[in-house]
Amino acid sequence: MRLRAVLFDMDGTLLDTAPDFIAICQAMRAERDLPPIADKLIRDEISGGARAMVAATFSMNPEAPGFEAQRLEFLERYQRDCAVHSKLFDGMAELLTDIEKAHMVWGVVTNKPVRFAQPIMEKLGLAERSALLICPDHVTHSKPDPEPLILACKMLDLDPASVLFVGDDLRDIESGRDAGTKTAAVRYGYIHPDDNPNHWGADVVVDHPAELRKVLDNAVCSC
């Protein structure tokens, strides 16, 4: 079936948001007179959300006293500084342009709350180009449930089989597959060292956004 839309996960797929997360975590350590930790320790936990990143930042059990206060502080800081260093991954700008030139649409389906996702999209000039932005605020069940992808296809009035969903986590692939879309896993994203995208069951696995452009060359999802 002809490919008519490409939907992206946000963090680790469409956007490199790690620099903002890392800056906040390192600043929180510095203010507590703690030395910086390897950025990779934080980056590896991004897919696990604020809870996982704070736990890694302070080597702290989430059940420990004071953890929730640290997590809330992290979220407050991120609300203020969520779009300072974030940017499109290398090659993604060209991919988005190719999608638009092929008269297809693209959008974002993320587990990031809209209070963070919308400002980032606006700051990067992507909000007006994107056909939609689906966040947990818009659904009852987030990924890996298929509801966000089902909603996206319904909003676009497209058969899920004509949609490609791109993500850097198993939950993205599960959500897309269960919604009936084609799926692509990206190895350049925020993947935990213990995880392997080759085992997720995606229709295609890529190392760079440029590899997805091959799918657009003939506008047929042959993945």
Locate each region found by the language model:
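Asp-based, Mg2+/Mn2+-dependent phosphohydrolase catalytic module
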Residues: 1-4, 40, 97-100, 114, ...
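N-terminal helical cap/lid subdomain that shapes the substrate entry/recognition surface
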Residues: 2-94, 100-102, 113-115, 123
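Generic enzyme active-site microenvironment
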Residues: 7-9, 109, 166-167
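Hydrophobic residues in well-ordered beta-strands that form the structural core
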Residues: 16, 108-110, 185
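Residue-level detector of anion-binding/catalytic polar loops
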Residues: 35, 105, 182
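Short glycine/serine/threonine-biased micro-segments
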Residues: 46-47, 105, 165, 187
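Residue-level marker of regulatory loop/turn positions in helix-turn-helix DNA-binding domains and
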Residues: 88, 109, 141
